[in-house]
């Protein structure tokens, strides 16, 4: 990594660098655009261009200083047509006061004042110059500065500040937007000092698949129902006691042999109780007296 050209107070910490490496912000595409060559560190044997994350950090700080220089946060428009960046721009707008356009950009939003979505921002920040090309093109018509997250193969035409990073991975996109929001809040004074940790975790900026979330909720609900039904199936005796029936007797061990032979009697030869024989003669019939 090349030495930083920033003042010492803006230098990145080792934790910031580790986070960018973990989120794979340094992995660019195999194709390369000529204007992005100064931001590349080297090319791997498999053809993947590796981005210099030191340059990435410098551009994040530069972009944050430009954003913080605008008095009214509502004059900043953050845009992402790429699904992986839509959650990030919404969170960025919520934390910094900017206006978010997540999803399809309506043509004419910057040039046609008749449309309901017409806006006149002083600055726009886009996730990908390729997917957000319509917004960049209209911004060039009305002289709006553009900040963009650019990969190794991203077109840089009409882009004023390019932040070199991997703009195709959901973790890389979310992390760069999170770092940009944190630097803006630091420059505005919302965070007391650079040593103060931001209480917003970076996970909130990561893309989440709605279908995966619904599937997870359904599985959790089924697991909860199974846990509730488990005691009834495993302990049927509890239901019998609830109905007022007597629970079956249980034995702690094998009964002693002496208990069975205590009487010493033979069941085969024992006489019936009462001294009567089952083979006794029937009583004689008596004649009725009229």
UniProtKB/Swiss-Prot annotation:
It is found in: Cytoplasm. It holds the Pfam family Ribosomal_S2. Component of the small ribosomal subunit. Mature ribosomes consist of a small (40S) and a large (60S) subunit. The 40S subunit contains about 33 different proteins and 1 molecule of RNA (18S). The 60S subunit contains about 49 different proteins and 3 molecules of RNA (25S, 5.8S and 5S). Interacts with RPS21. One of its GO terms (cellular component) is cytosolic small ribosomal subunit. Transmembrane segments: none annotated. Residues 252-290 are annotated as: Disordered. Belongs to the universal ribosomal protein uS2 family. This is Small ribosomal subunit protein uS2. Required for the assembly and/or stability of the 40S ribosomal subunit. Required for the processing of the 20S rRNA-precursor to mature 18S rRNA in a late step of the maturation of 40S ribosomal subunits. The keyword Ribonucleoprotein applies. Keywords: Cytoplasm, Ribonucleoprotein, Ribosomal protein. GO terms for molecular function: structural constituent of ribosome. The lineage of its organism: Eukaryota, Fungi, Dikarya, Ascomycota, Pezizomycotina.
């Amino acid at each position: 990594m090349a030495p930083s050209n920033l003042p010492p107070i803006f230098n990145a910490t080792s934790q910031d660098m580790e986070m960018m490496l973990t989120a794979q912000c340094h992995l660019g595409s195999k194709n390369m655009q000529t204007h992005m060559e100064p931001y590349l560190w080297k090319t791997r044997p498999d053809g993947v261009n590796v981005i210099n994350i030191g340059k990435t950090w410098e551009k994040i700080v530069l972009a944050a200083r430009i954003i913080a220089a605008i008095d009214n946060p509502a004059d900043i428009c953050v845009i992402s047509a790429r699904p992986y960046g839509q959650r990030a721009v919404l969170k960025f707008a919520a934390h910094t006061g900017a206006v978010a356009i997540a999803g399809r950009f309506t043509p004419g939003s910057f040039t046609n004042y008749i449309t309901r979505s017409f806006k006149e921002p002083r600055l726009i920040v886009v996730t990908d110059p390729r997917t957000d090309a319509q917004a960049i093109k209209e911004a060039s018509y009305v002289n709006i500065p553009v900040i963009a997250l650019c990969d190794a193969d991203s077109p840089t035409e009409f882009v004023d500040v390019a932040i070199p990073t991997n703009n195709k991975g959901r973790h890389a996109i979310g992390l760069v937007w999170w770092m940009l929001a944190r630097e803006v809040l630091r420059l505005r004074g919302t965070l007391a000092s650079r040593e103060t940790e931001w209480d917003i975790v970076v996970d909130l900026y990561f893309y989440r698949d709605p279908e995966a979330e619904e599937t997870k909720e359904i599985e959790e609900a089924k697991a909860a129902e199974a846990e509730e039904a488990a005691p009834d199936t495993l302990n049927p005796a509890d239901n019998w006691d609830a109905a007022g029936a007597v629970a079956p007797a249980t034995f702690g061990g094998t009964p002693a042999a002496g208990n069975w032979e205590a009487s010493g009697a033979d069941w085969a030869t024992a006489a019936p109780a009462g001294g009567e024989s089952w083979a006794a003669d029937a009583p004689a019939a008596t004649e009725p007296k009229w």
